[in-house]
Structures are given as structure tokens and as C-alpha cells.
Regions:
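C-terminal motif of bacterial Sec signal peptides marking the signal peptidase cleavage site
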Residues: 15-16
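Start-of-domain marker
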Residues: 19-75
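Sec-dependent signal peptide recognition
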Residues: 1-8
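Extracellular/lumen-exposed scaffold segments
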Residues: 46-47, 74-90, 105-107, 154, ...
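Acidic, glycine-rich flexible loop segments
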Residues: 126-164
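Mid-length scaffold segments of soluble, non-membrane domains
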Residues: 79-139
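A mature extracytoplasmic/lumenal domain signature
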Residues: 67, 107-111, 129-131, 159-163, ...
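Extended, aromatic/histidine-rich regions of cofactor-dependent oxidoreductases associated
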Residues: 163-204
Length: 204
């Protein structure tokens, strides 16, 4: 398994003779590959990992945004692509510049995870951008973050770490649909691209 992961990273152009950012993203993607093999629900097998594709890591795709908590926001049902819903609550709003455009992204708490000590700090950032359906998955992408990332009125969002939901590889999953307020009016050439393998239709 480890040899395959190393091969995948080399194939993607990530190696130890690179910038600190590239090294960080290399380690991040190593863990990302491992999760596919350790998760019993995973839609991918070991041989599929070589078909994962990513944009090169870039400094400008890691942005510092102002952050405004949304205290006492009400829980709501976030729809998923399967037709079911999941309970979330808006935790705060990040505001940032991308080129000559201003943008906002909302971050959410998954209410089903709040009582889990392993995830009580977890924040969910789903978004869409203008690469969706072209070079990236049409249903949007996700970034995992933590409450500790939001300190002193700012938050760092690293689009190099955005990834596809399981629905990009197979049906049968309850993948949240990014809310309209998180539709970005520009292209984000960072993180995971379209899967190069075949989509698996397993039914529901």
C-alpha cells in the first residue's frame, strides 16, 4: 500500500525536493489516500488511487479571510445528492478577495458530530466554483476545517486541500449539496480534479 501511495504522489509531481507548501500538501494527500483504504465505506480500491488527480499546490490558493462567527444560528437541513438531509448549523462566515473579486464562504457544524470527542472541533466547508463540471466534480468540493482555525477574527482557507465527495466516484452516498451561498463566481484551480477512473453505479 505505501509503495502505491508513494508512486501516486510522484506521479502527481509531489516529491521531497519541493517547497514547504508542497511538502505539507504531500503529507496531507498521503493521509487522504490512506483514508480510502481504511474506510470500510470507501468507494475506491487500492488500484483506483492512481486515478485520483489534483492541481499542483500553489501559495495563492491558500488565503487568509476575515471571519465573523454567526452566534446562535438556527439548525437547518442541508440536502444531499441522495435526497436525504443532514442537520447542520452555520458557524461563521469568511470574507476574502480572489483576484479582483470579493467572496464569502459559510462554514458549518455537523450537529450529529458535536457529541463525538473526535469531531467536536470539526467544521465543514462545502463549495462550488466555475471549474465544476469541467475540470472538477460537478457537484462541488469540500474542505475539512476546525474551530481552532478561526482565531482573532481571521481564518486561513487552503483550497489546495479541497477534495471530492464520495459521490464523485460512486452512487449510494449521502453527500451534502453545497448551499447556494457558497457558490463562488470564479474558478478555483486547486485541490482535487475530476476522477480519471470509471464511475461506479451500485444502486441504493
Amino acid at each position: 500500500m505505501i509503495r502505491l501511495i508513494v508512486f501516486c504522489l510522484l506521479f502527481l509531481g509531489l516529491n521531497s525536493c519541493s517547497s514547504p507548501l508542497t511538502k505539507e500538501i504531500t503529507e496531507y494527500r498521503k493521509e487522504y489516500f490512506k483514508e480510502f483504504l481504511s474506510d470500510p465505506r470507501s468507494p475506491l480500491k487500492e488500484a483506483d488511487l492512481a486515478k485520483l488527480d489534483f492541481f499542483p499546490a500553489g501559495e495563492k490558493e491558500r488565503i487568509t479571510a476575515s471571519f465573523q462567527p454567526t452566534n446562535d444560528s438556527e439548525p437547518f437541513d442541508m440536502p444531499t445528492y441522495s435526497g436525504l438531509t443532514r442537520k447542520y448549523r452555520k458557524y461563521g462566515v469568511a470574507t476574502f478577495s480572489w483576484g479582483n473579486k470579493q467572496a464569502t464562504l459559510s462554514l458549518y457544524e455537523n450537529l450529529s458530530l458535536l457529541n463525538n470527542p473526535d469531531f467536536d472541533d470539526y467544521l465543514f466547508l462545502p463549495f462550488k466554483d466555475e471549474t465544476n463540471g469541467v475540470t472538477t466534480y460537478g457537484g462541488g468540493r469540500y474542505i475539512n476545517m476546525s474551530k481552532a482555525d478561526a482565531e482573532d477574527g481571521t481564518i486561513t482557507i487552503d483550497f489546495n486541500k479541497c477534495y471530492n465527495p464520495y459521490c464523485a466516484y460512486s452512487d449510494g452516498f449521502n453527500c451534502p449539496i453545497p448551499p447556494r451561498e457558497n457558490n463562488l463566481p470564479f474558478e478555483v484551480h486547486a485541490g482535487e480534479r475530476n476522477f480519471k477512473g470509471a464511475y461506479t453505479a451500485v444502486g441504493h
